[in-house]
Amino acid sequence: MFSLLNSKKIRSWCLFDFGISSYPTLILTFFYGAFYAKTISSDPNVGTSLWGFALSAASILCFLLLSFILISGRNFFRNIKIGFFKFFFYLMIFFTFGLFFFDKGSNQFLPLFFIVISFVSFEIVNLFYNLSLCKIRKKNTTGALSNLGWAFGYLGGLASLFVVFMLLKFSNESFTIFNIKVFLLIGPFVAIWSALYGFSLFNVMKEVQFKSPNILELIKNVRSRGISNFLISYFFFNNAVVSIFAFASMIAAFIFGLSESEILFLGVSINFFGIIGCLVIGSVEDRMGSLNAVKICISGLLILTLILYFTESYYSFWVIALLVGFFIGPIQASSRSFLVQKIKAQNQMAAFSLYSMFGNLCSILGPFLVGLTIQLTDSIRFGIIVIPIFLFLSLIPFLKLYSKFNV
């Protein structure tokens, strides 16, 4: 698998995810959201609420923008050049860097505007990254390459997290270094980190163009090859995946009593096991078939989340959480490689626009249903059961599809 890195294009592709993964890791997941709620916002509860609204608004904007590209994009341009995606890459860098200028006393709404624009830009940049797989893959290596890239993404997130940890460790008691708050440096750091590892891919693919989406051609492609069943399956298991990410820290804290430092260590450990999972599954996917790889991951997650619902042991929770991390990376990477193999080259843009739309829809629907269940039952544990239900539903169209493909 690692011999693939001998190719400059593949190295650049993997390093691209290594770079941009710092954005969801540091801005959306670990540090910046808490800094905004505690410091910039007028009140922590208000800040947490506004942060959630901003991310929801960004997801809706992404969905609308991708819908426009999918449905109407072809009316405006027949081919999409690299410059289109490069523009959004610059936007992501600019608005992420700009977070440096917001501290206590700043307008609490303006940094959220920067978050929304950078988030939408990140999603478009991520669309480019997924699309690029079909341009750089080699014969019979799609599964290995997709998982290798996903592993690099995990690794980039962990590496950027480690750098911020070191800055915090060597800062003073007020978390300042060179008279600047470490948390203010997170935005510029993510921007520079993304640029440092991201520009290489644009350089090696500067002559590449992508066919503008044609929704009618995509529908024909999907129907003729039975891919609609896979997309239905993807919709359900992606709701489960998004819900796991959204509620993992709450499950850890309120059911199993993990402290904040333990939750942080758990998140790092899950990402580390995600790297292992991608490397293990990726090393055999092209022999077993991408569909088989996805099937194994769904089954593994279904069993683990069912056990999680019933378990009360602190140590069992750790084992389950790490194994969930093992499967949660490959299920996404193998889904991507399946689409790349089964969708015609001229329909890749349309397919991955739809793929990203599903992702944004799931980021709202999955957590909403889990949250609604928790509210109706007044139990976080009952909320967990929604996740294996999603996974079970994803197996129904998947089993019908299995007889048609072995890729």
Positions of the model-derived regions?
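Juxtamembrane intracellular "pre-TM" segments in multi-pass secondary transporters
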Residues: 2-10, 206-232
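Multi-pass alpha-helical transporter architecture, strongest
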Residues: 10, 65-73, 193-204, 382-407
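Short amphipathic helix-loop junctions that connect adjacent transmembrane helices
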Residues: 25-48, 246-266
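A membrane-interface helix-boundary motif in multi-pass transporters
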Residues: 44-48, 167-192, 372-391
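Helix-to-loop junctions at the C-terminal end of transmembrane segments
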Residues: 65-80, 277-289, 374
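Intracellular juxtamembrane helix-capping segments at the cytosolic ends
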Residues: 124-138, 330-344
